[in-house]
């Protein structure tokens, strides 16, 4: 299990982490000297694939485009072929991970967004509507 996956509270949600392989890949360009004093926004990109597979052609080019425009990007490789709420929990944990590592990645922790395509878009929209729910808060130790 990778370091990011170790931060996901699967057991709190009654999910066995066995066989799950969520990971997060930073696509962060070194800031120019002019940008040294400015924290950057961040985006977490979620691929589509019908929750059956992850389409890399949808994530890498998009993350690179964000990064080339001064937005630190992260590619979330969420678990597929799993029951709800596994992928949602992984995305929520990814936002928490990026926020907790904001200093390390020169990120403004108040400017983190998510985007996705197809299933990844559904996942992003689900988080957008449930992010402050008691449902996710109980798993992520966040106050409502």
Named regions from a protein language model:
Residues 93-144:
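Primarily recognizes the serine-hydrolase "nucleophile elbow" in alpha/beta-hydrolase
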Residues 51-52:
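N-terminal cap/recognition module
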Residues 46-47, 76-79, 117, 127-128:
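Active-site-proximal beta-strand/loop segments in catalytic clefts of secreted hydrolases
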Residues 55-56, 75-109:
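Catalytic nucleophile-loop/oxyanion-hole region of alpha/beta-hydrolase
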Residues 39-48:
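Short beta-strand element of the alpha/beta-hydrolase
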Residues 37, 55-74:
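Short amphipathic alpha-helix adjacent to the substrate-entry channel of hydrolases
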Residues 42, 67-77, 113:
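A fold-wide structural signal in alpha/beta-hydrolase
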